[in-house]
């Protein structure tokens, strides 16, 4: 079974408090990827709460973002219809809320080992790499691919470095 994981394509990461020109530039690529994908599509959603500034992440990245229920927390409008088109027993509406860099319930969500995963989204050097490595840990023999043309890092340099780390862990990187 093929699974496309769209990582954190939320307003705050695209054109909000942590948005970048690179993140804005990948939106059309991600939309085309989603439209043409044959398989199941899941979205991760970075989720913080009003106490964000008191968390470890808030102390190290003192920019409030993706606060639950805010506009910045929302999946971008270009992808929202694709994100909210399913319901299953584990994931509500195809969106997996995560409260740290990586989603930690992969094994509960995908109980079998017969999956191929493809990831894209933001930020390559934080949440994309964290989720790719978590998938590698839970599914050591799975084909895991990251589409570089559908990812953006905090900076272009960090994007490139994260791609190299993923390659080192037998994650296929395409469209560099």
For each predicted feature, which ranges?
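Acidic, Mg2+-coordinating phosphoryl-transfer loop and its flanking beta/alpha structural elements
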Residues: 139-142, 146
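Active-site acidic carboxylates
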Residues: 1-91, 112, 145, 154, ...
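Active-site catalytic pocket residues across diverse enzymes, especially alpha/beta-hydrolases
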Residues: 83, 107, 139
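Histidine-anchored nucleotide/phosphate-binding helix
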Residues: 29-36, 129-139
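Conserved N-terminal glycine/acidic-rich loop preference
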Residues: 90-130, 152-176
């Amino acid at each position: 079974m093929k699974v496309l994981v769209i990582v954190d394509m939320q307003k705050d990461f695209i054109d909000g408090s942590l948005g970048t020109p690179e993140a804005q530039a990948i939106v059309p690529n991600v939309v085309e990827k989603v439209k043409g994908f044959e398989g199941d599509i899941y979205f991760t959603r970075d989720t913080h709460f009003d106490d964000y500034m008191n968390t470890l992440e808030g102390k190290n990245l003192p920019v409030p973002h993706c606060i639950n229920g805010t506009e910045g927390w929302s999946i971008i409008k270009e992808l929202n219809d694709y994100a909210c088109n399913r319901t299953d027993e584990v994931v509500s509406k195809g969106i997996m809320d995560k409260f740290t860099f990586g989603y930690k319930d992969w094994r509960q969500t995908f109980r079998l080992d017969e999956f191929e995963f493809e990831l894209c989204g933001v930020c390559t050097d934080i949440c994309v790499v964290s989720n790719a490595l978590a998938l590698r840990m839970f599914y050591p023999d799975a084909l895991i691919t990251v589409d570089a043309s559908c990812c953006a890092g905090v900076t272009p340099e960090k994007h490139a470095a994260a791609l190299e780390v993923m390659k080192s862990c037998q994650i296929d990187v395409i469209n560099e």
